[in-house]
Amino acid sequence: MARRSIRTLVLGLASAAAFLFPAASARLAGESAPRTQASAQAPSVVAIRNATLITVSNGTINNGTIVLRDGKIAAIGANVQVPAGATVIDGTGKFVTPGLIDAHSHIGNDAINEGATAVSSMTDMGQVLNPTAIAIQRDLAGGLTTANILHGSANPIGGGSVTIKLRWGVEKGDDLIFEGSMPGIKFALGENPKRQGGGAGGLQGNQSNARYPGTRQGVEYVIRDAFTRAKKYQKDWAAYNAASDKATRIPPRRDLQMDALVEVLEGKRLVHCHSYRADEILMMIRLADEMGFKVATFQHVLEGYKVAKEIAAHGAGASTFSDWWGYKIEAEDAIPGNAGLMTHKGVNVSINSDSAEHARRLNTEAAKSVRWGDITDDQAIGLVTINPAKQLRIDDRVGSLDVGKDADVVIWNNHPLSTFAIVEQTYIDGKVYYDREEDMKRTAEATSSTSDSQPAVTGNLFDIAPEAGKVVFNVNGPTWAITNARIHTVSGPVIPRGTVVIRGNTIQAVGANVSVPSGARVVDARGGNVYPGFIDAQTDLGLNEPGVRNFDDVSEILTFNQMLRTRVAYQSDSDAIAVARTEGITSAGIFPGGGIIGGEVPLMNLDGWTWEENVVRAAAGQAFSFPGGGGGGRGGGGFGGRAGGAGAANSGLRELETLLAQAKVYGQNPNRDMNWSLEPFLPILNKQQAFYISAGNDNAITQAIAWAQRQNVNIVIRTSPMTAVSSAAALKAANVPVIISTVLTLPQGGDNVFHAATYQAPAELEKAGVTFAFSSGGFETVRLIPFQAAMSVAWGLSKERALQAMTLDAAKIFGADKLVGSIEAGKIANLVVTNGDAMEIRSRVLHVVIAGKDVPLQNKQTELFNRYMGRQ
């Protein structure tokens, strides 16, 4: 019944003539209308000419032609004749690849978990497919054509999986299914099926609600017991079917749970096993060997690099994340070189998404393994094409550009492993299911009446407060130089071939004709690039540690925490700090949470023996969650506000206003006794510091700006990219800068919003003249700041402004632009040296300089990579 009602709703939506564009989001709207099977039709013959064809199976063909006929690849090569009557597409400057394949997806599902039982093999994801789910269209826009739709990980043995093609808008869920593909089944190991207190297994709040198992050994037993029963069930049916008197016998009881497991034993159903730790991966290999079946893929497999030899020997594939880590205790030893290391050890590896958002950019997720896994470009593209095709046993149909295979192809405007690559068209079975030009035409129509661009705020946003003087410029330390580099000063023009001289912790000189002092150590950059150190404008790095140490000092319990010196809790030896700084992040705004006022916001360097040595600016202001501002607390998806209705919000503001009024009186008394509840507000009232206001919607931003004007204080807004855009006029008019949460997230506002709205948001802010900075929000993704900038450039932001947003503009937002943010004589020597464009994922960081120190490019993850690469 539920399925029919959902289908009815879906078909009603699909019959609409077009999506409507909300006026408040006109700039970011422009989504295409839902496609029906008819609207996705293409001419029977299509020829793409003069393109770079990345075949995957037979190398790369420059200036080649590929012909699509009747849903298949009919011809491909450098000298292919275009058939008469074919629709010809000029591929000059374009790249063509096979459609991307995601071996772990949950898009287009009405539900993913059946958690009531430890074995739910009787369920099947093919029964709950929604062909008009907007996630399908958004992932098509990223070049995805095939996905393995998996059950969730609530059970040691979960439900059946199904492989689909992303034929968005077909009438029935069954029309998505990849014809002839093998069915699968989801297994799950580790914390998900056993976790206690709100998870799938273990104790569910109290003993009476416990669901077995609650341990890893319990998970192993559930699977072992199920297959023991399945083998007996298989034997009973075999005996019955072979009996000469079968017609008079009573058949064995039909068991839908066992039917699926017998298919596994007979090699008719693929096992896809959710896993994290090396011990549980090895356990599953040994158990599968004992029971007589093969694991098709280990999913997630974050510690697969530790047992790569065993995975390869078993013949299993490994489908992993590119660089996810630290988000749960099982992910503490995850490394971004996992896919590369397993590839080197002979495992068939794919990169998956497990996320409708990550599936939009599987191409650049694969490119990360070039940077961190030491694999080639061809191997990286294989991670999202032929390798998952082999894992799903569909490589005879898709995964490479070969004659006779399905015409699932993608046209890109740049090399698909480039951070700046965008999909132009996506074909499935020779039909166009996504066309960027159509989407951009609609976007242009929606934005035709918008205002002209405005210049951004320039100069210092805030005076530097007295405590910033704790940063000591030391020119008595070692002198060394970086030479033969392309120097991106940010504050001035690029120096094509220049030198930076560093003395102590300070930049002594920079220019094209700078002399290196006698005796100085010289680093020859050999044509590399030198940038100011990158700044993450909001994170809890150093306050929140992943893994077994698992300290969390982000949020205090009071409503007003202005007396808290956040810097004193900064754990300078955090594993997460080293992970971030080796990728060029040299400084970060460290934000506490909790209450209305969370505490002081320091700007900290990412290297130093102690927190004192890490300080750039001890306190740039106070973290302020605007009452009633909405949002969602810690993390990269959005900035939170205080819970409660309008009454609670007004009460909170009134209480803060009372504190500020008291602080004004307090500050006028030269003989005052110290009051730590009022003292921290004095530099804010003197406009030496700012309130960093978290506001989750347009109304909250409008109210926050008006409130700040009444109080005569400086503010910085912290909000999502799309909310910043919809409030851009107000931000510009008040000269209020904004820290945006990650752009690498799904657009807000429902299905009608343009699929790339978050990627485009920084360009819209640039056009509106709003000063902004990028942020991660959490410790796990700090290293991705340059790639947020790159995605924004791909969708319209100028490269100059992108670089500013993660250097000088970020420094201005913290009132620290006289200290960091650009390469100028007299500033702190925070620098990054790369062998290519810093925003390109495949570029490598060669040197990171923090306060004049050439910091070793080592962290826990590089150490694990090197250690296990040496395992024989």
Spans of model-derived segments:
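Bacterial N-terminal signal peptides
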Residues: 10-23
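N-terminal pre-domain segments of enzymes
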Residues: 28-43, 444-476
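Histidine-rich, glycine-flanked metal-binding segment
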Residues: 32-38, 53, 57-97, 491-531
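C-terminal cap of metal-dependent C-N hydrolases
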Residues: 51, 402-445, 485, 824-868
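Divalent metal-coordination and catalytic microenvironments
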Residues: 51, 66, 71, 93, ...
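His/Asp/Glu-enriched, well-ordered alpha-helical/loop segment
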Residues: 112, 118-123, 270, 309-312, ...
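Polyanionic/metal-chelating signatures
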Residues: 140-295, 299, 416-418, 422-423, ...
